[in-house]
C-alpha cells in the first residue's frame, strides 16, 4: 500500500501580494509556502504510514525552486518526492494541471490498495477543482471534504463534511481523497527529518518523461491547453473598522447611531 500526496507551492498571502502591471501575480517576488490544505493531506498520508507502514510519495508541479518545498515535506516524514517541471507545463489552469498531475501519478503507479491525497483547494485559486479532476482522469472513486479517515481492510470509512452536517462514506481503494483542515493537525519537521531529507530520493518528471502518457498532448497542457483565462489579480481594499455595541441598551445605542447618520 502506498500513499501519493499532491501538493502545491502557493504565494504567502499573509504578506504583501505583488501584482504585475498586466494584472497577474508576480510570484517571483513573493514569499511562498506549502498550500495549507495540502499539509492536512500529507498528515493524513503520514498517519496511514504510521498505521500500515506504507510509503508516502509527495508530488508537485512547479518551477525548479519548488524542490525546496518538497525537501521540507520529506523532512516532515514523506519517503519520496517528485517534481513535475518543464516549460511546456507553464501557464496551466486547473484543467491542464490535472492532466499533467494525473499523468505523473500514472507514472508513479497506483496499486489496488493505494490512496491519492489532495488538499481541498489552493489558497491562490480557491477552485477546489484539481483533486476531483485528477480522480476523473484516473478513473478513481473520490471523496471530497474529508474530515476523518478510518482504514477497514481494502476500503476506507470516510467522514465527509457537508454544509449542514456530515456524511459517512465507505470507499474502496484505490481512491482519491481531498482533505480539509478539520481532518488533523499537521506535524512539524523533526530534527532527524531535517538532517535526512536530502538523503531521500527526489525525481524530476519533465515533458519528455510524461509525453507518452495519453493525457499529455500539446493541446491539453500549458497555456495553450488551458480554457481558463485570468485577466486580473488584485488585493481587495481593506474594510473600515466596525463598531461593537455592548450592554443591555444596544438597541438604544444603535438607534442613536442611525439617527446621527439621518438613517432613521
Question: How would you label these PLM feature ranges?
Answer:
Residues 1-264:
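N-terminal glycine-rich FAD/FM-binding segment characteristic of electron-transfer flavoproteins
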Amino acid at each position: 500500500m502506498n500513499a501519493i500526496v499532491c501538493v502545491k507551492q502557493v504565494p504567502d498571502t499573509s504578506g504583501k501580494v505583488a501584482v504585475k502591471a498586466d494584472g497577474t501575480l508576480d510570484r517571483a517576488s513573493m514569499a511562498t509556502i506549502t498550500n495549507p490544505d495540502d499539509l492536512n493531506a500529507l498528515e493524513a498520508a503520514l498517519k496511514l504510514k504510521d498505521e500500515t507502514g506504507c510509503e508516502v510519495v509527495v508530488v508537485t508541479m512547479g518551477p525548479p525552486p519548488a524542490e525546496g518545498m518538497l525537501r521540507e515535506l520529506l523532512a516532515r516524514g514523506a519517503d519520496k518526492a517528485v517534481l513535475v517541471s518543464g516549460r511546456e507545463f507553464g501557464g496551466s489552469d486547473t484543467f491542464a494541471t490535472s492532466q499533467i498531475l494525473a499523468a505523473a501519478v500514472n507514472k508513479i503507479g497506483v496499486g489496488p490498495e493505494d490512496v491519492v491525497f489532495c488538499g481541498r483547494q489552493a489558497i491562490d485559486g480557491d477552485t477546489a477543482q484539481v483533486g476531483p479532476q485528477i480522480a476523473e482522469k484516473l478513473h478513481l472513486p473520490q471523496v471530497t471534504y474529508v474530515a476523518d479517515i478510518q482504514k477497514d481492510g481494502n476500503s476506507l470509512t470516510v467522514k465527509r463534511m457537508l454544509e449542514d452536517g456530515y456524511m459517512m462514506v465507505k470507499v474502496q481503494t484505490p481512491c482519491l481523497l481531498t482533505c480539509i483542515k478539520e481532518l488533523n493537525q499537521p506535524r512539524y519537521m523533526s530534527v532527524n527529518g531535517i538532517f535526512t531529507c536530502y538523503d531521500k530520493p527526489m525525481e524530476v518528471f519533465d515533458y519528455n518523461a510524461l509525453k507518452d502518457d495519453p493525457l499529455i498532448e500539446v493541446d491539453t497542457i500549458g497555456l495553450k491547453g488551458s480554457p481558463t483565462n485570468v485577466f486580473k489579480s488584485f488585493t481587495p481594499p481593506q474594510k473600515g473598522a466596525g463598531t461593537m455595541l455592548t450592554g443591555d441598551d444596544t438597541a438604544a445605542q444603535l438607534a442613536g447611531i442611525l439617527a446621527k447618520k439621518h438613517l432613521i
